[in-house]
Amino acid sequence: MSLSKVKHIVLVLSGKGGVGKSSVTTQLALSLSQAGHSVGVLDVDLTGPSIPRMFGIEDAKVTQAPGGWLPITVHEADPSTGIGSLRVMSLGFLLPRRGDAVVWRGPKKTAMVRQFLSDVFWDELDYLLIDTPPGTSDEHISLAETLLQKAHPEQLAGAVVVTTPQAVATADVRKELNFCTKTGIRVLGVVENMSGFVCPNCSECTNIFMSGGGEVMAKDFNVRFLGRIPIDPQFLVLIETGKSPRYPEGTSVNGQDISSATQVAANGDETRDSRLLVYKYKSCSLAPIFGPITADIIADVTR
């Protein structure tokens, strides 16, 4: 099984679409890499694979090896800066054209998920993050059954569940938490995404979708609340254009001044180069927020 070299497997789940699972997966991967861990991301959102675009590698094509695939490298490990390697696998790399629709029935989706879990040749990984579609569909059932049957119990660390603050979102995400209970998947915690909006001019954070719904839900299910993540337009600029985030002078997040933290390894290179994403993300206002979330997950998984 291709998961034999993986230490910890973390699922990123949500019962609601559009809550930012792929964004959370991307930032968890970057934060883990910044902490020196080797990371893989497996995108099993078969009908809407967005992970390739998040990392700026949507034009990449996987290499076919005897019996499987070699994942795409986002960046290699850099011992001089303490950065860990990051690799990605997605159905998006296998489509003939980027805009092609995937119109598959349940059995074919199930077979594809199982193939992804068995036929991708990962190097030694500290963490494999699995980005999933919304809901509790065939992909989720196949994923849970395969992991529970074939992965070692110590490998399957658990799930990070993503929601937004509104009741219309948490109502569906509660079903995902029930799914985890029924399938025996441990919940590592709940992330409340899109909890506030960071003004690009003054960096003040305003609640536009309410706030606190994710924390209330976590308490109701007696699971850890990992934190709130606001919407930051500068993160979108980074993902879409490759330009480093920039903020007004004196902008501080969690006591860290990020207004001058724009140095990247490329010495100011503002091209959309996936190899530089992990360095540029350090200057994003969301990085100091994801840092403690990532640390909590690591502490929970490795205790």
From Swiss-Prot:
ATP binds at G15, K16, G17, G18, V19, G20, K21, S22. It is found in: Cytoplasm. InterPro entries: Mrp-like_CS (IPR000808), Mrp/NBP35_ATP-bd (IPR019591), NUBP2/Cfd1_eukaryotes (IPR028600), P-loop_NTPase (IPR027417), YlxH/NBP35 (IPR033756). Binds 4 [4Fe-4S] clusters per heterotetramer. Contains two stable clusters in the N-termini of NBP35 and two labile, bridging clusters between subunits of the NBP35-CFD1 heterotetramer. One of its GO terms (molecular function) is ATP hydrolysis activity. One of its GO terms (biological process) is tRNA wobble uridine modification. It comes from the Eukaryota. Its cofactor is [4Fe-4S] cluster. Pfam families: ParA. [4Fe-4S] cluster binds at C199, C202. GO terms for cellular component: cytosolic [4Fe-4S] assembly scaffold complex. Heterotetramer of 2 NBP35 and 2 CFD1 chains. Belongs to the Mrp/NBP35 ATP-binding proteins family. NUBP2/CFD1 subfamily. Component of the cytosolic iron-sulfur (Fe/S) protein assembly (CIA) machinery. Required for maturation of extramitochondrial Fe-S proteins. The NBP35-CFD1 heterotetramer forms a Fe-S scaffold complex, mediating the de novo assembly of an Fe-S cluster and its transfer to target apoproteins. This is Cytosolic Fe-S cluster assembly factor CFD1. It comes from Chaetomium globosum (strain ATCC 6205 / CBS 148.51 / DSM 1962 / NBRC 6347 / NRRL 1970) (Soil fungus). The lineage of its organism: Eukaryota, Fungi, Dikarya, Ascomycota, Pezizomycotina.
